[in-house]
Amino acid sequence: MKCAVIYDSQTGNTRRAAEWIAEGMREAGAECGVFRIEAVDEAFVREAKGVVIGSPSYAALMTADMRAWLLSSGGKLGMGGKLGGAFATEQYTHGGGELVIQSILTNELVWGMLCYSGGAACGRPVIHIGPIGVNGNVEPHNDLENYRDYFTVYGRRFAAKAAELFGER
């Protein structure tokens, strides 16, 4: 079963988070493609059963490039019926990551995707709407590496749910 992770990244932090999600997906047995928005493999995404989309928070919103991609390209990839998910990175604690995730999930719902949240049902760590990582550039006590497990666990759970829904491994 194929799953895709699509992201925008300004400093490399969101790219790292995307790779961690893909690592978790692969641990769950999924074939995973990781794509920056400028280089999405459309054929792979069309075949994927699940797609997770991520963006850094910029002024408490997704990046302008991600918003443009969602409006121009995202809906043309046959997203309806797929399992969808979202993640974010931010430079500050409470830097808008939740808003970014909610905006991405709203786009996914408009496309007809089934949106994933393991919430509290999967136990700890509890990841309600999607993982958020804070980098250490501004807040030295926060290092993106501290959030790695949230991203890999989310990827593993996401791929397992996609396999359960679509009956594939």
Where are these regions (language model features)?
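Accessory recognition modules or surfaces
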Residues: 3, 10-13, 50, 74-80, ...
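N-terminal beta1-alpha1 ligand-phosphate binding loop
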Residues: 2-28
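Hydrophobic anchor at the start of a short beta-strand
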Residues: 3, 32-33, 115
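Generic secondary-structure signature for well-ordered alpha-helical cores
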Residues: 26, 71, 75, 109, ...
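Glycine-rich phosphate/pyrophosphate-binding loop and the adjoining helix
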Residues: 118-169
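Helix-loop-strand module that forms the ligand-binding subsite of alpha/beta enzymes
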Residues: 38-124
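A short, well-structured beta->alpha microelement
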Residues: 30-40
